[in-house]
């Protein structure tokens, strides 16, 4: 039997060799399956602010903004004119911008991850709300941090400040120059923090901005703010009334997450096109809907927190931008639902529905940012007051 097996093996070797001589190659092994690429975003439809189920809102004359002291829901557009405060003005004191760099090698909280280039993930066949990502790996990063210190800042005093996502944000600094000079907002420092790279599930940015926990706020508190105070020779207030968060898209949901999980640190929130949807990764059993849970159950079922919130969404904001179809990826509906539950709980908030506006619409920001900053900072009396 043993000799027969040897003969068979020899015959096979001869046949393979003959095929190669005749120019015929053995069939190659099948290539391993490639991870799914991120799908292209579909063009969102324009949504009607008067759709049944949306919040009742006051439609303003085209080109105008809500008053800076007005709570509630408002409709603006369809044209978006740049506010005068968004332009550098001669004679207005200009703040100093310090440009810092942070490395993942120095972070105890975020050592860094990234999704392989050209990959995304696949939906769990058993759970449409869960994205399986197999191509996210430890990856180092560097981030920029731009710190705006107004000309009027008095050295040694504890200053109010605003923390912004996806920095640096030069337009914020221009607005603050003008608003501070006109005494419409306090003399504040702005800390515009770059993200750790990438976007959405499996990326460092997604981990920072979409995770429903206090971790990013803790990173800012323990790693960013001490660096800012040391390198920029400033003192930052510990008073949550003098601290604000700001962002767009996932940076907007991050702004809300920071204040929600750490209201002892932040009382003021400003968001454009907030990603209050199911984008958290990895999935967390405590908040299975990610930031969708804000309006689904967290805000409705929690005691009112001392937050003042300004928020905006565009009529052409994102709708199912990736392959997940879990009924929790509608940015317009998410922000409408946020406005509804905030009103029901009695929060001070202003919600702007912008017509003829897309996701993180630049024209809308140029029109509304000065008024949004005024609204968010309304009622601030100063350090220790």
What residue spans do the PLM features occupy?
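Disordered, low-complexity segments in secreted/periplasmic proteins that are enriched in proline
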Residues: 24-44, 385
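Non-catalytic cap/lid and distal C-terminal segments of serine-dependent acyl enzymes
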Residues: 54, 61-385
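Bacterial N-terminal signal peptides that target proteins for export
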Residues: 1-9
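Short acidic, Pro/Gly- and aromatic-enriched capping/linker segments at domain boundaries
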Residues: 42-59
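Bacterial N-terminal signal peptides
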Residues: 8-17
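Sec/Tat signal peptide C-region and signal peptidase I cleavage site
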Residues: 19-23
């Amino acid at each position: 039997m043993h000799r027969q097996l040897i003969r068979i093996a020899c015959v096979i070797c001869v046949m393979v060799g003959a095929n190669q001589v005749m120019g015929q190659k053995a069939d190659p092994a099948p290539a391993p399956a490639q991870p799914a690429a991120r799908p292209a975003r579909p063009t969102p439809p324009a949504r009607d602010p008067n759709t049944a189920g949306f919040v009742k809102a006051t439609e303003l004359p085209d080109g105008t903004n809500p008053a800076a002291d007005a709570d509630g829901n408002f409709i603006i557009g369809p044209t978006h004119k740049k506010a005068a405060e968004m332009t550098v003005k001669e004679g207005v004191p200009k703040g100093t911008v310090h440009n810092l760099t942070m490395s993942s090698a120095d972070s105890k909280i975020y050592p860094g991850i990234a999704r392989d280039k050209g990959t995304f993930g696949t939906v769990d066949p058993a759970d449409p709300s869960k994205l399986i990502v197999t191509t996210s790996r430890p990856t180092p990063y560097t981030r920029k941090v731009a710190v705006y210190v107004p000309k009027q800042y008095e050295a040694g005093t504890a200053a109010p400040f605003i923390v912004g996502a996806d920095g640096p944000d030069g337009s914020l600094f221009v607005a603050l120059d003008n608003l501070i000079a006109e005494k419409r907002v306090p003399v504040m420092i702005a800390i515009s923090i770059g993200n750790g790279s990438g976007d959405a599930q499996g990326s460092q940015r997604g981990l920072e901005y979409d995770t429903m926990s206090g971790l990013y706020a803790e990173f800012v508190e323990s790693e960013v703010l001490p660096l800012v105070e040391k390198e920029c020779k400033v003192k930052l207030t510990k008073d949550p009334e003098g601290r604000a968060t700001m962002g767009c898209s996932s940076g907007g949901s991050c702004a809300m997450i920071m204040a929600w999980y750490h209201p002892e640190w932040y009382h003021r929130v400003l968001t454009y096109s907030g990603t209050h949807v199911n984008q958290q990764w990895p999935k967390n059993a405590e908040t299975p809907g990610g930031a969708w849970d804000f309006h689904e159950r967290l805000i409705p079922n929690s005691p009112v927190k001392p937050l003042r919130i300004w928020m905006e969404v565009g009529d052409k904001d994102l709708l199912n931008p990736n392959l997940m179809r879990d009924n929790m990826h509608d940015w317009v509906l998410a922000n409408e639902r946020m406005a509804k539950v905030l009103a029901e709980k009695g929060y001070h908030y202003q919600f702007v529905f912008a017509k003829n506006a897309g996701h993180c619409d630049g024209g809308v920001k140029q029109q509304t940012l000065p008024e949004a900053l005024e609204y968010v900072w309304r009622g601030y009396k100063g350090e220790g007051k």
